[in-house]
């Protein structure tokens, strides 16, 4: 169990950049390790800091999961093109939060099996993944005003492109996050319900009173020209909206749709193992009681499939990407349509 913040030692991670210096810096967050391959080694997490004068600080993160490529790619590109003269304040760019997972192309770290987005607030005396989480919680988040964490579905999910905020106790914090999610300019904005939010990066940020916007921008363990274009436009909009970069918001061609996930019944999870057939395409409307998926027994033929039905009206916001499914896997996510924002 993690110690209370007052009992914890300083993070073992050190930065090769000066977060207070004006200009553009590219460097690393260095986490010491010792293993069979490197007795005196380090996990090297790339970081870029772009700063000019006084102003807000935005923390932009990708690679929280290593098989979600839109955020990784878009932030790598941003780190090469964003100039100090473009910025009023400070932009901290970490394209690959969980660098070991990213280099392995896996959701979790090959070093300790850690899922970074289930490891917060972290522990400076814990595993590699817990130490990374701790550094973000106690070093980077406190120096930030707004945080954008870029996700997609990875290898096992495909998700409509959206920016998300959460229901919060602080109404003003919730309002500002929702405005940022809408300003991101993805085809969808959503008020997202998390199945277990306790150890998420989202929660660690929100508990510090910071503005947090998350995204889901595709999936299948790849990226597309369309998903990258949405991601890059959204990052630019985020920086404009929160006053770090001057400019106008880039508005999508089609009206943005605002969705809500009110509770856990939005998630349709399999009670069987077998072959998955989705009967509804991603983004299509569904009605309560409609068959949205079938699971076939793969151990014999001539057996009728098990049907899964929608528990609410809405749109298919996410779906399992592989055709094989195990008991407990999320088959689909259905979100309710609140309004068209066009």
Swiss-Prot record:
The GO biological-process annotations, alphabetized, read as: ectoine catabolic process
**UniProt entry tagged with the keyword Metal-binding:** yes
Q: How is the cofactor bound?
A: Binds 1 zinc ion per subunit.
Spell out the residue ranges making up region: Disordered.
103-124
Any GO CC annotation of this UniProt entry: cytoplasm
Please indicate if the UniProt record lists Cell wall biogenesis/degradation as a keyword: no
Name of this protein: N-alpha-acetyl-L-2,4-diaminobutyric acid deacetylase
Q: Which organism is it from?
A: Halomonas elongata (strain ATCC 33173 / DSM 2581 / NBRC 15536 / NCIMB 2198 / 1H9)
């Amino acid at each position: 169990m993690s110690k209370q913040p007052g009992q914890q030692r300083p993070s073992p991670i050190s930065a090769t950049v000066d977060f207070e210096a004006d200009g553009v810096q590219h460097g690393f967050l260095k986490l010491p390790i010792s293993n069979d391959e490197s007795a005196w080694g380090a996990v090297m997490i790339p970081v870029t800091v772009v700063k000019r004068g006084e102003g807000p600080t935005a923390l932009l993160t990708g690679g929280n999961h290593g098989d979600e490529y839109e955020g990784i790619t878009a932030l790598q590109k941003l780190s090469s093109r964003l100039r100090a003269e473009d910025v009023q304040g400070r932009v901290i760019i970490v394209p690959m939060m969980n660098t070991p997972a990213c280099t392995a192309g896996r959701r979790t770290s090959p070093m300790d099996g850690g899922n970074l987005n289930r490891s917060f607030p972290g522990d400076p005396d814990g595993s590699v993944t817990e130490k990374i989480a701790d550094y973000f919680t106690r070093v980077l988040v406190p120096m930030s005003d707004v945080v954008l964490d870029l996700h997609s579905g990875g290898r096992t999910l495909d998700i409509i492109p959206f920016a998300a905020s959460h229901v919060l106790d602080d109404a003003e914090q919730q309002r500002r996050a929702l405005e940022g999610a809408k300003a991101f300019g993805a085809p969808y904005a959503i008020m997202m319900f998390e199945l277990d939010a306790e150890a998420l990066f989202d929660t660690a940020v929100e508990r510090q009173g910071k503005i947090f916007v998350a995204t889901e921008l595709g999936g299948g363990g790849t990226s597309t020209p369309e998903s990258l274009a949405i991601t890059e436009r959204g990052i630019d909009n985020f920086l404009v909206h929160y006053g770090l970069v001057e400019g106008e918001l880039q508005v999508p061609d089609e009206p943005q749709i605002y969705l809500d996930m009110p509770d856990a019944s939005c998630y349709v999870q399999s009670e069987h193992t077998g072959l998955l057939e989705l009967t509804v395409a991603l983004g299509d409307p569904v009605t309560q009681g409609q068959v949205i998926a079938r699971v076939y027994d793969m151990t014999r033929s001539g057996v009728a499939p098990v049907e899964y039905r929608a528990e609410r009206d809405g749109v298919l916001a996410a779906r399992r990407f592989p055709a094989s499914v195990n008991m407990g896997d999320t088959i689909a996510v259905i979100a309710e349509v609140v309004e068209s924002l066009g």
